[in-house]
Amino acid sequence: RIREVLEERKLVAFCANGSILPRKSGVSSQPLKDAIEFQSPESMEISIDLPFGNSIRGIGIPEGVTLIIGGGYHGKSTLLQALEQGVYNHVKGDGREYVITRADALKLRAEDGRAVSHLDLSLFIHDLPNGKDTHCFSTEDASGSTSQAAGVLEGIEAETSCFLIDEDTSATNFLVRDAFMQRVVSGDQEPITPFIARVRDLYEKVGISTILVAGSSGAFFHVADT
């Protein structure tokens, strides 16, 4: 029922109040004992009616560009990891039974060394110094930025509705170029168009939302909806 509500209300994800998001360890799927329960900020709290007359409250993350921000060790990545796993249904006792994300959402991260085969990366990568054509790009050993650009294009082809991105596992030069760096390296000398320059078009023209964890760069505030 909640998955249907996401579509109806133009939400990409829902996380119920009282959910236990941290895991016992990095290699365990069991909930962390005595963990702090999740509580939605009032400004984003919604109620969803369940079958048989019950209802559940929690955070509803709308379509568009959403930032998850906060200090270190405050659970930003833990929330994103829970949303990543929210494409699956969870068994009772998992702690994330009511963490629900659209089933076609895609985690996007840098994958240094991955292969890329015949992808048009010109949306992000262009005018390479070696003259290599990025409209049909192949490599057996992609850099972090190239691999993440490839992930975006593969997501578009797969018709994903939402990218889930953590600043910590991304290639910095793929996500953003600050104003100082733009002055040091002019646009005609930089072959990478950062994700921040495309994130609005991805939503407004293609219908792909983004949920992004940010802890060190405030650049995405200017393009975020939430």
Where does each model-flagged region fall?
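Phosphate-interacting basic helix/loop segments used at nucleotide- and nucleic-acid interfaces
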Residues: R1, G144-V152, Y203-I208
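Long, basic/Gly/Ser/Thr-rich N-terminal segments
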Residues: R1-D34
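Short, ordered loop/turn segments at secondary-structure junctions
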Residues: S19, Y73-H74, E111-G113, E167-S170, ...
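N-terminal pre-Walker A segment at the start of P-loop NTPase domains
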Residues: P22-R57, K92, I100-A105, R109-V116, ...
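Glycine-rich phosphate-binding P-loop
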Residues: I56-Y88
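Flexible beta-alpha connector loops of hexameric P-loop NTPases
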Residues: R114, F124-S145, V176-I192
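Phosphate-binding/switch loop-helix module in NTP-utilizing enzymes
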Residues: H135-S170
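Conserved P-loop NTPase nucleotide-binding/switch module
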Residues: I156-V199, Y203-E204, S216-D225
